[in-house]
Amino acid sequence: PGVAESWQITPSSMTFTLRADARWSDGTAVVAEDFVFSWRRMIDPKVAAPYASTMFPILNAERVHKGELPIQALGVRAEGNQLIVDLQTPCGYCLAVMAHSAFFPIKQSFYAAQADKYGAEAEYLLYNGPFMLTDWTHGSRLSMKKNPFYWQREEIHLNEINVGYITADNRTRLNLFRDQQIAVARLGAETVKDAAKSGLRLRTFPSGGMAYLGFNHRQGRQTAKVDVRRAIASTFDSEEFVNKIIAIPGYRSTQSFFPSWVQ
């Protein structure tokens, strides 16, 4: 949606009209074919893309991913400056999902020129967003600068972004934030309580994740009986469990596998 100036959605299709001023960081136009190439690559079973299943609402996507149909059968095509997506089934959440990075376009000629180096380093990537990666020390740091060809560049008020510390350790991130080495830190379950007790300002946001309790269905187990599972489920207080047992700020109980934003 960020590259489109408008879109129309019906139960059977989605049509995106691309911005005429959408550009890659090399100055060339972002075209509908860039999305077709990218999406076909993602659904290719040989690629084994981890988010390929997010495309399954698209016509033939699941069968293509299983190898039952050729990649060209995927229900996506370019017509001029429009990207047309045919749906296998009505999809109320598809517009939100298509903002995920897995659906980003790829310029085919650039991809082919990089061969197997595509995406391996900053110089082997092409960008159509507000910033370009200029330095990437894997697992340590990265730097970005403003993309001079971005269609809304006048609204971007930062010239550079420097991420001086990259770590998967939640405790390290919190300590770096406390030492004013970083401006924002994403917290984990083991650090969010400490941050709250310290009086730090916390912001919560939907993570796209869900936790649940599962039953052991092995033969001979009491929980293999559906009536036992129903009895436990009917007496389980999710509000009590989340708010008093887990007791992590930002966690919410839910009664459905579907997130609240699904229409």
Predicted regions and their residues:
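Sec-exported extracytoplasmic/periplasmic mature domains
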Residues: 23, 40-48, 90-92, 99, ...
